A protein has these predicted regions:
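Short, surface-exposed patches at the edges or C-terminal ends of soluble domains, predominantly
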Residues: 2-614
Length: 614
């Protein structure tokens, strides 16, 4: 009886506890209905509005209005509209009254006409039946944004996924703000040196008639029209560079700069609040040259950059610890790995994260929150902070691994091949660096009557040197694409081309998103708008596995081809074994832990019952 009485009391107490907990849950939900808080644990804060977006909105002179035209009725569409609404609410909370939005579902002829007149495009939406039957639900409607600021209007005609949406919304707001307030960001690209051009169509393999293809400048001007990229011909340094440019870009030259031209560049930087970005190295290669035979030349940049504390060395970097790899099919139906140590694949590695050996500085605007970057055909840089005043920061932002050799011969064979032989000595090399502050003139102490330059900039100027000759292009398409005939033969597009190089050019395109975002972030940095670079990180997909727990093969000087192949195979085997362990751990590990916890609780409760005194 005592036992039954005890059980009745326990059951009554349990019921009371359940009622109390349920009441607390109901009250908490009622009180928290209007409260909003979520935690974003992703590295790039993928699901949190960037602080820079909030500052942009709060800094507007008048409120921006967004009309969001949406379509609901399918589970995936409903989920997307909820995510979109949550994001717009975050903008509203961060905007300090400068952001307003309206959700509109065009379910009448009048609203549909309104959406079409605004510039939106009606889109079909489909969703497979989740019951497993061979059926799908199809609907049609509008899913886009209309932005209004002052007298200006802009449209994002179609939005299909929440990932990266903040990037496009924030940059579109910036676009209409700049247009309404007549804010211009003019970027000069130095020309007249047979240089690599941002208008070169070598991002992807050329196919069929018409050649063509996307260009770096075309992508920037179409997606981010608030940047105006203009050519600047120094013409022997006869005239000063237009002071209205926010910055200059130097791309890989084929001809040398003379001293007067370099002094004009220095004169521009000494104006203060200016930027110079150099995408060049000593490794010089010709476009459409399938031999990939490079010559080493600094083209006069060695007379300018050392004065800012960044010396470019006349060498070609070969990084055997972070070399570019690509899998290619074999005749037997398998796959083999082709390596190119002349193309450094720099990955952010927590094991090398001190100021003196960090591989990729992901706090720098150009590589902000990026897990990897590709540096084709780099030269090493030597930093000398004594060349600049103590308050000017000269720092490396990208390095190779310690397993890096350099070649200093006049010509270097960069052609793809099965085996590469490391040469001593091997050490870590700097391949990208910045100098930021009130810069001292690179020609301080050696004035010229032809170009009179201030000894020091009155305000902060910025220099970035990315010592990679083909950073802004696809190196395999650059070498493998056939030349455009031009003139009366233009209709035939590119002719010829190297099939093997073009085969490698296609998989290389997966790295171009990071390259384009790095370039766009660098433009923001040049214009002094680096506050918005955090939004770019949300466009980058989830990074590939880096296998940081597995040591990469260490290629030593003197390794013969057989030894190098053996190390490659051991590395691939270790990666495959790691994949297998992770697979089975995820398959059986969690269920086993759950079962073990259940057994533990069962034994615990059994022990308590056995100890119960009647």
């Amino acid at each position: 009886m005592a036992s039954q009485e005890h059980r009745r009391k326990a059951a009554a107490q349990t019921s009371l506890y359940i009622l109390v907990i349920a009441a607390i849950a109901v009250v908490a939900n009622v009180l928290g209905a209007k409260a909003y808080k979520r935690w974003d644990t992703t590295q790039a804060e993928r699901y949190t509005l960037s602080a820079g977006s909030g500052r942009l909105i709060r800094g507007l002179n008048s409120p921006v209005q967004i009309d969001a035209y949406v379509k609901t009725g399918l589970p995936q569409l409903d989920a997307f509209v909820k995510d979109l609404t949550d994001l717009l609410k975050e903008y509203e909370r961060a905007g300090g009254g400068k952001f307003k939005f309206t959700i509109i579902e065009p379910n009448t002829d009048e609203l549909r006409a309104q959406a079409k007149e605004a510039g939106l495009t009606e889109t079909p939406f489909g969703e497979a039946n989740q019951t497993g039957e061979d059926q799908a639900s199809i609907t049609q409607g509008y899913m886009g944004l209309v932005l209004k600021y002052g007298s200006e209007k802009a449209v994002i005609p179609q939005i299909m996924q929440a990932e990266g949406l903040e990037f496009w919304i924030t940059n579109k707001i910036r676009e209409i703000r700049d247009k309404a307030e007549n804010i211009k960001h003019r970027i000069g690209v130095v020309t007249g040196k047979d240089e690599f051009k941002l208008t070169d169509a070598n991002l992807v393999p050329k196919q069929g008639k018409g050649g063509g293809g996307p260009t770096m400048q075309g992508i920037i001007e179409q997606a981010f029209p608030f940047y105006k990229v203009e050519e600047v011909d120094l013409k022997g340094g006869e005239n000063a560079i237009d002071k209205d440019f926010v910055g200059l870009i130097i791309t890989q030259p084929q001809k040398d700069y003379d001293e007067k031209e370099l002094r004009r560049i220095d004169e521009f930087l000494m104006l203060g609040n200016k930027a110079l970005v150099v995408y060049a190295s000593a490794v010089t290669m010709k476009a459409n040259d399938a031999t990939m035979n490079a010559t080493l030349s600094l083209h006069g940049l060695d007379k300018l950059l050392p004065g800012y504390g960044i010396k470019m060395n006349k060498d070609a970097v070969f990084d055997y610890g972070a070399q570019f790899r690509i899998g290619v099919p074999t005749q037997g139906g398998g796959f083999t790995t082709v390596r190119h140590p002349g193309i450094a694949h720099v990955v952010s590695d927590s094991r090398l994260d001190s100021e003196n050996d960090r591989l990729l500085d992901t706090s720098f605007a150009g590589f902000f929150r990026m897990e990897e970057a590709i540096f084709p055909f780099a030269s090493s840089l030597t930093l000398d902070k004594s060349k600049q005043p103590a308050d000017v920061k000269v720092a490396a932002v990208a390095r190779t691994t310690p397993a890096t050799s350099v070649v200093t011969s006049d010509t270097v064979d960069m052609k793809l091949r099965a085996e590469w032989e490391p040469k001593p000595p091997q050490e870590q090399r700097v391949i990208a660096a910045t100098a930021i502050g009130k810069l001292k003139s690179a020609f301080a102490g050696s004035p010229s009557d032809a170009v009179k330059v201030a000894e020091r900039a009155p305000t902060e100027s910025r220099i970035l040197v990315i010592s990679s000759s083909e950073f802004l292009t696809n190196p395999f398409a650059y070498a493998g694409n056939g030349p455009d005939l031009g003139g009366q033969f233009q209709m035939f597009g590119a002719v010829g081309g190297d099939p093997q190089l073009l085969m490698f050019a296609q998989p290389y395109t997966k790295y171009l998103t990071s390259t384009i975002l790095s370039f766009k972030n660098t433009l923001d940095w040049m214009a002094g708008d680096a506050d918005l670079v955090a939004t770019s990180a949300k466009l980058i997909g989830d990074p590939a596995l880096t296998y940081s727990d597995i040591s990469k093969p260490k290629f030593k000087a003197g390794d013969d081809p057989a030894e190098a192949k053996k190390k490659d195979e051991e590395y691939r085997g270790a990666r495959k074994w790691m994949q297998t362990k992770v697979q089975w751990t995820l398959t059986f590990g969690v269920p086993v832990l759950f079962a073990a916890f259940g057994l533990f609780r069962w034994q615990q409760r059994k022990s308590q019952r056995d100890q119960l005194k009647i």
